[in-house]
Structures are given as structure tokens and as C-alpha cells.
Amino acid sequence: MARRRKYEGLNPFVAAGLIKFSEEGELEKIKLTPRAAVVISLAIIGLLIAINLLLPPL
């Protein structure tokens, strides 16, 4: 529980360690919810896997 209280007021990205504390203000300019960020990252990963399967290395 102590860990949860420690990160209670923080941006979810900062609490997860995805960005540095000094960069927190920069993230606020991008209007993304944490759920949207996860969906976008999963879509990018899926796209890269599909490209790898369709276009084998030369």
C-alpha cells in the first residue's frame, strides 16, 4: 500500500516509469489517455509483426 500512496497524484506514465519526471510537462501537451497509448502501442507492435511475416528478410 505504501507504493500506491507514493504514486497516487502522479501522471500514470510517470508512475509506470515510462517517462522521466523532468519530461512530465512535455507529455501534457499530448492529449492521450493511458488506454489510448496502450492501444496505439499494441497496434504498432502488431503492424511490425505482420510486416515481418509478409516480407521475410532478404
Curated annotation (Swiss-Prot):
Q: Which parts of the chain does the record assign to the membrane side Cytoplasmic?
A: 1-33
Q: Kindly list the places in or outside the cell where this protein is found, as annotated in its UniProt entry.
A: Cell membrane
Gene Ontology BP annotations:
protein transport
Which InterPro entries is this protein grouped with? Answer: Preprot_translocase_SecG, SecG/Sec61-beta/Sbh
Which residues does the entry place in the Extracellular compartment? 54-58
An example GO CC term for this entry is:
plasma membrane
| Top-rank taxon | Archaea
UniProt main location, coarse: membrane
The keyword Mitochondrion is annotated on this UniProt entry: no
What Pfam families does the entry give?
A: Sec61_beta (PF03911)
Q: How does it sit in the membrane?
A: Single-pass membrane protein
**Partners and quaternary state?**
Component of the protein translocase complex. Heterotrimer consisting of alpha (SecY), beta (SecG) and gamma (SecE) subunits. Can form oligomers of the heterotrimer.
Question: What does the UniProt record say this protein does?
Answer: Involved in protein export. The function of the beta subunit is unknown, but it may be involved in stabilization of the trimeric complex.
Q: Which NCBIfam families match?
A: PRK01253.1 (NF002318)
What family does the entry list? Belongs to the SEC61-beta family.
Its protein name is Preprotein translocase subunit SecG
Q: What is the source species?
A: Pyrobaculum aerophilum (strain ATCC 51768 / DSM 7523 / JCM 9630 / CIP 104966 / NBRC 100827 / IM2)
